[in-house]
């Protein structure tokens, strides 16, 4: 079966357009990772860039440094998991062959 080079180029252009659209959608994703009953909230976008970190002030005196570090790590990991879930839900079916 011969492959028509023009059809191949059309498909590649369409594939590139799909990738560009997905990148745009990913940049618009915003999620919040939370830890310690919302003591710490990390806002992250679909490009895994942290936009904001919030720590409830009233909990500073009650937390030791190790507990605070653990909650910050947990909030970041929660945000990363949520971004991955959003990306997966937005890209399922839009990429050929399950890529």
From Swiss-Prot:
Subcellular location: Cytoplasm, Nucleoid
InterPro entries: YbaB-like_sf, YbaB/EbfC
Keyword Transcription regulation set for record: no
Gene Ontology CC annotation, any one: bacterial nucleoid
A single GO molecular function term of this UniProt record: DNA binding
Keywords attached to this entry: Cytoplasm, DNA-binding
Organism domain of life: Bacteria
Pfam families: YbaB_DNA_bd
Function according to Swiss-Prot or TrEMBL: Binds to DNA and alters its conformation. May be involved in regulation of gene expression, nucleoid organization and DNA protection.
Family: Belongs to the YbaB/EbfC family.
HAMAP family the UniProt entry points to: DNA_YbaB_EbfC
Quaternary structure annotation from Swiss-Prot or TrEMBL: Homodimer.
Name the record gives this protein: Nucleoid-associated protein EbfC
Annotated organism of origin: Borrelia hermsii (strain HS1 / DAH)
Source taxonomy: Bacteria, Pseudomonadati, Spirochaetota, Spirochaetia, Spirochaetales
